[in-house]
Amino acid sequence: MGNVPLLREVGKCQRNMFGRSTASSKGSSNSRSSSSTSPKKGPRREADALMFIQIFIHLLKSNIGTGFLGLPLAVKNAGLLVGPVSLLAIGALTVHCMDILLNCACHLTQRLQRSFVNYEETTMYSLETCPSPWLRTHSVWGRYVVSFLLIVTQLGFCSVYFMFLADNLQQIMEEAHFTSNVCQPRQSLVMTSILDTRFYMLTILPFLILLVLIQNPQVLSIFSTLATITTLSSLALIFEYLIQTPHHSNLPLVANWKTFLLFFGTAIFTFEGVGMVLPLKSQMKSPQQFPAVLYLGMSFVIFLYICLGTLGYMKFGTDTQASITLNLPICWLYQSVKLMYSVGIFFTYALQFHVPAEIIVPYVVSRVSENWALFVDLTVRTALVCLTCFSAVLIPRLDLVISLVGSVSSSALAIIIPPLLEIATFYSENISCATIVKDIMISILGLLGCVLGTYQALYEMTQQTHFYMANSTRVHI
């Protein structure tokens, strides 16, 4: 794979993706005017350029996380027929929007004579050329909105990681005394839980605080390697179990429309890599090959999504839980699967957290004297970790938080914004009416999913508080 660690390369992309957050508003306006006339050096250097297979691996890694393990429940919420078909449709729509984003960014780099523009810059420069005078005047707000959505999405991922770690750790600890080498199917029995899930979240908190204080790229690359190894090993064992018979029959092909709204949020959340498309292309040794990597990689990702979601739902039926790891049988083999995947998620937390921290921390530190810089740096990082933890404590429902984050921020970044950018970018260049209608319809579809999915997730959160309290005393053996 080369001498440069893969994570270090992607970390550079992610930091460049968000731009210079510490610049003042006055300075940013000056930099925009000057950058339009002079080329800007992009994040890719020839020595650091990544090969086809490396970009392919990064694309897979950026789209396989905790949301991936929630797809069986998502298929349950949509139905055995509607779920896989909808996953395919949403996947195709998301990839199309990624392609739109790439085309807009490529066009703007040529127009502005720059080597690279990130998502926020693409939004800002697109608005500067749109037909609306008001939007042209306030184009910088497009950059701020996208940056805010990216931060919310990344911190939302971190909150989901807290819940995932707590749920799996609770199950491992409370089932340890009757776990053996013989795998037994999991059946539901009502028993008194030893400790609440929230206790495990608070137990994990200090370890994650210590983890995020590590900022050395070489150490982070080691974390990335460990996360990749444990995640791939766990997924191999999970798929090995899912293909075994028996499977449930007579499962509903079409589910309730209200639960389908939860499916939409989960499906969009699972496509976590939309923010990585532009920086990954900028890091590629042969950028002209990136569309091939994108379509090949995302086709494989969608195939994995459909397989896991469908096989998982067929395997566990109505007992399907928020994460498929919670449905695995009781034996040391599959307890080790939970442990390995949890280790991978634990280290991935630091990688996901690194992105919003690189935006927020420098901005805050620049407001204090040098004597207080280190203290403020550590304090802000600690506060952000605590924020993600307390968010998980307040809403300890993994499936609903995944759906909420997906509906609120992921849908905007993946579906709503890119088509609007295409209209704004190419409006002055005689864009066809058919393309405008197509883009408007895609954005409206994404907006409907965002509003209705958010409403349904919030409704379920308020209505099922008592359900969670009852479920916290339920252990599976």
Curated annotation (Swiss-Prot):
Region span, Disordered: 19-43
Which UniProt keywords are listed?
Membrane, Transmembrane, Transmembrane helix
Cellular compartments per GO CC: membrane
In Swiss-Prot or TrEMBL terms, this protein is called Proton-coupled amino acid transporter 3
Tell me which species this is from. Mus musculus (Mouse)
Domain of life of the source: Eukaryota
Give the location in the cell: Membrane
Ranges of the Cytoplasmic topological domain: 1-54, 99-144, 224-225, 281-291, 366-374, 421-432
